Amino acid sequence: MKPSYFSTIDSASIKMMDCDSKVGVLATEDERGYPHLSFISSIQALNEQALTFGQFSAGLSKRLILDHPRVGFLVLSADKRYLSGNATYTHSANTGKEFDLYNNKPLFRYNSYMGFYRIFYLNLERISALKPLPMGAIIVGAILSRVKALFVKKSEKGALPFVGQSLFSQLDSLKFLCYYDASGEAVLLPVVQATSAGSDRIALSGIPFGRALKQIPDGAKVSILCLNLKMESVLVKGLYSDGVLEIERVYNSMPPKMEYVYPRSETISPVRDF
């Protein structure tokens, strides 16, 4: 069953997105056609047909959105309700009403070290209704994913560092999956049940969201963002088949240095002359 989408944001969703204590995920397209997922807690509704988010660090997504303006998004509230949708980037600004509103938020108002220095504006394409996370099913799915991981475990390339494997294996860490459907739209799903299966794979059961996961074609380019309550995060990208992601790239999405850690973008040569 495909999710139902709407062309405007209802009042309940606007109120939820206006809250600062939420998790926001933005999906842009990278240079290889993979979804690139970023933690964007500042995303909120400007009105019924537009969204905004603020920038306070120079991550890759803010550059990618200029080349590929069509994006996906998912927002998860503190009371475990979520929505998702798609939008198109239109412009950005470093002055104006929204700029002042963002920087007057309690977290940033008296913060002289870090503030929003650019606001991004997006036109809404579609948005889902607010839905509760099925916590009971997630617990069952997490157990089944860990059993599955025992049978598909692979650690030949050493793609995902040990700290990333530990982050994925935490039962309370959040995970979000994204792929592009047949029409080229980014589809985001919460996949809290996912876990690491060695350093080279991520395993997830079909509970919950089994029908939605079955819509992902074998061999599709898929990305999964994992983060915990300490805001530690890692992004993996790879090819998906039957509930297993074969990791091709690993991106450190935490400041201060956000970069690919597998394969490494730079080589370190040993010092031989003293």
Task: Please provide the spans of the model-predicted regions.
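Binding-site signature for planar aromatic cofactors or substrates
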Residues: 1-274
